[in-house]
A protein has these predicted regions:
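Cysteine protease catalytic core and zymogen-processing segment of caspase-like enzymes
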Residues: 68
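Glycine- and acidic-residue-rich phosphate-binding/metal-coordinating active-site segment common to enzymes
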Residues: 103-122
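Conserved small/polar residues in nucleotide/adenosyl-binding loops
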Residues: 123-129
């Protein structure tokens, strides 16, 4: 499915966190586009920083950091010929399972099965009337 990501994002007041994966027309190269945006001051206080083997989020101004729990994480980690991209600290869990070959053929699923999840929040859901 082809989408013009520029038009989509330009028309969206709050795109939140996003991950786009794609490949070159010849299928030989892959790309990842990742963006972050926040509603709260704490969530907006982060930027990407390159690290060995990936990209992580860090506080733009450490003095303004309130709660790092949901905003500071490895966003991208590369393991041999595999790249793990997520929008939270589950990147580390998946990378650990895949790197250790803990469940051959099922590492991704097995890693996520170890996680707990927040309850669904409908505070931003607008239902039709």
């Amino acid at each position: 499915m082809k989408k013009n990501i520029y038009k989509y994002l330009a028309g969206n007041d709050y795109p939140g966190r996003g991950i786009v994966l794609g490949k070159s027309p010849d299928g030989q190269k892959a790309f990842v586009a990742y963006w972050i945006m926040g509603r709260s001051a704490n969530s907006r206080n982060r930027v990407f920083e390159p690290i060995d083997g990936g990209i992580r989020t860090v506080a733009a101004d450490p003095a303004k950091l309130e709660d790092p729990h949901l905003i500071i994480y490895n966003a991208v980690l590369t393991l041999r010929e595999t790249t793990v991209v997520t929008n939270g600290d589950q990147t580390d869990t998946i990378a650990r399972f895949m790197n250790g070959n803990l469940f051959p053929g099922y590492s991704f699923e097995a890693a996520l099965a170890t996680r707990t999840y927040e309850a669904v929040s409908y505070t931003h859901l607008t239902l039709p009337t």
